[in-house]
């Protein structure tokens, strides 16, 4: 069992030697890749060592129990621990999403529901910012268009992780947030106390780590400049600092007006554009992928209603995994881990079913 681990153990040793080579650290890109792979394999190495040790302990306990029945009491506990260690190792051997260690760019847009939808978009932004803070991730608001009541018609935020371990990566956790988020509550603008249903859309894409990773020909870009506007459309700048970038081959349009400098807005716009072009390329690859890939949770389906936030009942429900809890107030304050973990587990189960093997 777990014959494939032997090769991974050898690879882990090779990477460990590479990490001790000063020349590796002179190449930032290669160093990052080696560190990430080493961190990923370190989990497998530790889990395999635990599984092996428990197997040895169980064998020893059974042998001793033949001579001294007192040792028989240890056997059930060791068997249970061995089964748990085996399941842990089995899950770690599931092929990971190659983008799991990447940082992300998240866009939250108001949907059906007008002003209430924009307010909900602001609540979602706050939830994700608090969640990022709890995981010690760094956040940067790249662009925002506010509504009249203080919500957001559209807001884009970059979220950057602090670990080389793909299992702790930002994309590994937030890729499941893409889709339509529905809210049920009494809007601030509702005078009769009636519950309304509205929605906001969330798009999450992995960020491009190196400019060379996505080839964008400057001749394929149409760049327009204009004056920044605030809530209600009023101008908030006397210079043409806002930038709209159109990628002609794909039709992708990115608009930035958050910074006071046109150059800063252009740099931020290109950052988002590269990520969107990469995501589109990946979507095209996924569209041609096997049923194995398509059977997994649809992380990039922007039209899918993925979750409902019911404020009167303090209930949150994820429609993909069946997760339900009555702690919506805590979730909106950033306690999102249980929801995310339910998605990760469902994804792992789908991958295991698709593989059709016990590894």
Curated annotation (Swiss-Prot):
Major location category of this protein: cytoplasm
Any one of the GO CC terms: cytoplasm
UniProt-annotated location(s): Cytoplasm
Function recorded in the entry: Peptide chain release factor 1 directs the termination of translation in response to the peptide chain termination codons UAG and UAA.
Pfam families: PCRF, RF-1
Protein keywords: Cytoplasm, Methylation, Protein biosynthesis
Source species: Clavibacter michiganensis subsp. michiganensis (strain NCPPB 382)
Positions bearing N5-methylglutamine: 234
Protein name: Peptide chain release factor 1
Keyword ATP-binding in annotation: no
Keyword Flavoprotein set for record: no
Record's comment on post-translational modification: Methylated by PrmC. Methylation increases the termination efficiency of RF1.
Family: Belongs to the prokaryotic/mitochondrial release factor family.
Domain of life: Bacteria
